[in-house]
């Protein structure tokens, strides 16, 4: 992983389900997996995968068959390239949920996973500041209780790619969605996140303020950030959080 950087989010549902971008008040979350497949002298090749999670009970819009992500230069926020990713087998799958604490009623809580991959690798030239990837959509799940306006808040799924000239460097793989990815009321939960790093680097996790979407998608399902990291606006917490 080295200095690969991701933004993570933990948000609480009314039924104390923890989630991991348009779907109309349906998005639960997502992540990027970036794999360097070839490190060249002036550029490198990457395979980019996006995983999306949606509320399959309350969500109105289905998983899109394709998404277009943007890749931008850090420091300039200039678009380097866009990339179309395709939904595997053109269909999502339902995430199995449940443990000894709580087994959700699938008629009430049901999460769909969509996995998106490109048809070809993405080539990025050496650039000293590196790049960031963004996919955005709206809106979040209306049952989220710790955000002030979740059904109008979008999401930016985000990752940073260091300068390709630094050598072999891939992102972590978050593995399967945890079956017990929720907290029960007045209870604690401890689980091992099934994350691995192909480069053997150490992994550190942090809870961060969730990223909203940018000011309108101008590059497919993406838009350039502004200013310094984290480049995109954050969501406003509800009172008390």
Show the residue positions of the predicted features.
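Bacterial Sec-dependent N-terminal signal peptides
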Residues: 1-28
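Long, compositionally biased, intrinsically disordered segments
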Residues: 22-241
């Amino acid at each position: 992983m080295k200095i690969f950087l991701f933004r993570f989010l933990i948000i609480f549902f009314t039924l104390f389900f923890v989630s991991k971008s348009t779907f109309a008040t349906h998005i639960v979350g997502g992540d990027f997996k970036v794999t360097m497949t070839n490190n060249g002298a002036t550029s490198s090749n990457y395979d980019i995968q996006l995983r999306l999670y949606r509320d399959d009970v309350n969500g109105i819009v289905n998983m899109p068959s394709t998404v277009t992500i943007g890749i931008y230069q850090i420091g300039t926020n200039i678009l380097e390239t866009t990339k179309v990713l395709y939904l595997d087998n053109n269909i999502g799958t339902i995430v199995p949920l449940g443990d000894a604490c709580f087994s959700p009623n699938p008629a009430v809580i049901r999460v769909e996973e969509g996995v998106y991959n490109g048809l070809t690798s993405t080539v990025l030239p050496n650039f000293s500041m590196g790049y960031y990837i963004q996919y955005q959509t709206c809106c979040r799940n209306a049952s989220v209780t710790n955000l002030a306006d979740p059904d109008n808040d979008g999401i930016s799924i985000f990752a940073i790619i260091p300068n390709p000239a630094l050598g072999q460097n891939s992102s972590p793989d978050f593995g399967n969605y945890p079956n017990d990815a929720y907290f029960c009321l007045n209870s604690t939960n401890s689980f091992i996140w099934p994350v691995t790093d192909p480069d053997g680097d150490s992994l550190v996790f942090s809870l961060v303020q969730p990223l909203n979407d940018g000011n309108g998608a101008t590059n497919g399902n993406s838009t350039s950030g502004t200013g310094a990291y984290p480049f995109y606006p954050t969501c406003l917490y509800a009172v008390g959080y």
